[in-house]
Amino acid sequence: MVNAMVRKSVLLVACLASQNMTVFAGEADVVKVAVDAKSQGVYNFSVTVSHGDTGWEHYADRWEIVDNDGNILQTRVLHHPHVNERPFTRSLAGVEIPDHIERLTVRAHDSVHEYGGTVVSVDLQGRH
């Protein structure tokens, strides 16, 4: 009787844990941004994101370049989970940034929490 109760308790805990694993991955954090000016107003971005992807049900699914007014200038879609690659870096080339923008923010998004992780601000002054 005791063994049966212990087995049921272990099974219940395992089921609850597997259903809630997506919560434990946390929010997606931008940990590094490298910007390379290619020509007047055109840049290449390499962005490193840290997130505890657990699979298709919870993963970092994109990062975005946002101006100071909250307008999304460009989006880099992440097409699959990075379960065995943490942190990971992905690039986006040929990003056109209007000349009047001197500072922007790079933020990451995940499929459960959406936004809320660490962002990185980038100063573009002197890069033109």
Regions found by a protein language model. Name each.
Residues 1-10:
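Bacterial N-terminal signal peptides that target proteins for export
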Residues 20-25:
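Sec/Tat signal peptide C-region and signal peptidase I cleavage site
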Residues 26-61:
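Short, surface-exposed binding/anchoring microloops in extracellular/periplasmic proteins
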Residues 34, 46-48, 64, 93, ...:
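Residue-level recognition of well-ordered beta-strand positions that form the cores
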Residues 37-41, 65-71, 96-102:
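A short, structured loop/turn motif at beta-sheet edges
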Residues 58-83:
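The feature marks short-to-medium sequence segments in extracytoplasmic or secretory-pathway proteins
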Residues 74-103, 107-114:
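Short, solvent-exposed, Trp/other aromatic-anchored flexible loops in extracytoplasmic proteins
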Residues 118-128:
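Short beta-strand elements
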